[in-house]
UniProtKB/Swiss-Prot annotation:
Family: Belongs to the transferase hexapeptide repeat family. LpxD subfamily.
Coiled-coil zones: none
Biological processes per GO annotation: lipid A biosynthetic process
Protein name as annotated: UDP-3-O-acylglucosamine N-acyltransferase
Organism: Xylella fastidiosa (strain Temecula1 / ATCC 700964)
Pathway: Bacterial outer membrane biogenesis; LPS lipid A biosynthesis
GO cellular component, one term: membrane
SUPFAM superfamilies tied to this protein: Trimeric LpxA-like enzymes (SSF51161)
Segments traversing the membrane: none
Assembly information from the UniProt record: Homotrimer.
Length: 338
């Protein structure tokens, strides 16, 4: 495990240090759990009361909170971002040896870089390509005509069905499925006819896709995630969607076919997005919201019913059904008074 002094961290990240610069930091932890050999941070004012009693050797915080701390501190404009950067110094991953495991299966027409790691029980299909320094974890399946660019990682049991292109430094967690058939059906004489899904999936550089998430291939055009998109666990992105660069989508969100989401958007957990609509750049959708219409103005949007006690909720549920009747009565009274 690496060790850094407080002074070394201050110099490395251009931070102002107050206190003992010789304190040696072995790791990171929360304010309540950190030991004198660990670094912590304060980014949310609601945790300010934890600051005086924290045993952390060094705390990253905003200049306004210095007086509440008792030990060494590092001053940061954005303590959360600074903590994230420092934490990466302690996130040491074991090195993977380059080469193809004897229990992997690689089609003769596929290309695997000699610097890539291909784990046990991996299957790589025809005409697929694995770039330099890629890691293809145990049990992953890469179908035909897939391309994985340099430095990308499929952690384990990831499935790329066909016609999937990953950019550089893409990271995909276990159970994710990319390139599955989109949900395309046409009704004829009381029976569904399956519409062939002839497009692919394109994932930009520096994207991350969480465990058990699914991204369907397009019907005609590709389904596209632009660069630096981050997808949480259990997210469904349907065929022909386009997700703009630097957008983040939290768990259990579902995005229906052909929806277009802009750049720098944030979608909270369990959001539903109706198909064939557009969301502009810099939009925040709070958790449990349902987006039924296009959004053309940046900002924060919400829907759904906030949590309340059951007794109040039941009363409000009954009154909600009465809203139309009450509005009509009010309009009638207004007309009579007029």
């Amino acid at each position: 495990m690496p060790i850094f002094t407080a002074q070394e961290l201050a110099e490395r990240f251009n931070l102002q240090l107050f206190g003992d610069g010789n304190i040696r930091i072995h790791g990171v932890a929360t304010l309540t759990q950190a030991s004198p050999e660990q670094l912590s941070f304060l980014a949310n004012p609601r945790y300010l009361t934890q600051l005086p009693n924290s045993r952390a050797g060094v705390i990253v915080l905003h200049a306004d909170d210095v007086k509440a701390a008792s030990g060494a501190v590092l001053i940061a404009k954005d303590p959360y971002v600074t903590f994230a950067k420092i934490a990466t110094l302690f996130d040491i991953k074991p090195a993977r040896e380059a080469g193809i495991h004897p229990l992997a299966t690689v089609d003769p027409s596929a290309h695997v870089s000699p610097t890539a790691h291909v784990g046990a029980f991996v299957s790589i299909g025809a005409r697929s390509s694995i770039g330099a320094s890629c890691i293809i974890g145990t049990g992953s399946i890469i179908g035909d005509d897939c391309t994985i660019d340099d430095g990308s990682e499929l952690i384990a049991r990831v499935t790329l069905i066909s016609r999937v292109r990953l950019g550089k430094r893409v990271r995909i967690h276990p159970g994710a499925v990319l390139g599955g058939e989109g949900f395309g059906l046409a009704m004829e004489s009381g029976h569904w006819i399956k519409i062939p899904q002839l497009g692919g999936v394109v994932i930009g550089d520096d994207c991350e896709i969480g465990a058990n998430s699914c991204i369907d291939r397009g019907a005609l055009d590709d389904t596209v995630l632009e660069e630096d998109v981050h997808i949480d666990n259990l997210v469904q992105i349907a065929h022909n969607c386009r997700i703009g660069a630097h957008t983040a989508i939290a768990g259990c969100t579902g995005i229906a076919g052909s929806a277009k989401i802009g750049r720098y958007c944030l979608l909270g957990g369990h959001v539903g997005v109706v198909g064939h609509l557009q969301i502009c750049d810099n939009v925040v959708i709070t958790g449990k919201s349902v987006v039924r219409n296009s959004i053309h103005t940046p900002g924060e949007y919400s829907s759904g019913t906030p949590l309340t006690d059951n007794r109040t909720w039941r009363k409000n549920a009954v009154r909600f059904k009465q809203l139309d009747m009450l509005v009509r009565r009010m309009m009638a009274v207004s007309k009579e008074k007029a």
